[in-house]
């Protein structure tokens, strides 16, 4: 049994809000869609983050504009909203692929709005 599963079974959802980080989860080898399905109603906060193969450094993946990577961010956001209990969306991006952080903020916000959030 994984530590995450032990935590999820042990934490009282009426006392603790779980924030699922869909990008870091992918980077760690898990699939956010599967986790949302396994624990419906448990993820009030969703860390919306997409990943691509890293261009260098020690990491295998780096963050990118949501919807442009390999995480299936839109499908995860939609499912988390539908069955995961998600009400708060926190967009995160630490790598910018030649853009400025503000350009990425604007693009990520535009995409979330296009998705209906």
What do these predicted ranges mean?
Residues 1-20, 24-117:
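Histidine-acidic metal/acid-base catalytic patches
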């Amino acid at each position: 049994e994984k530590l995450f599963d032990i935590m999820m079974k042990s934490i009282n959802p009426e006392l603790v809000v779980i924030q699922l980080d869909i990008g870091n989860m992918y980077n760690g080898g898990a699939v956010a869609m599967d986790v949302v399905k396994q624990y419906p109603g448990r993820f009030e906060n969703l860390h919306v983050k997409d990943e691509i193969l890293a261009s260098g450094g020690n990491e295998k993946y780096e963050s990118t504009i949501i919807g442009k990577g390999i995480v299936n961010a839109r499908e995860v956001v939609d499912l988390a909203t539908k069955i995961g209990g998600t009400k708060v969306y926190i967009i995160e991006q630490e790598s910018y692929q030649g853009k400025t952080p503000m350009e990425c903020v604007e693009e990520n916000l535009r995409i979330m709005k296009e998705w209906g959030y």
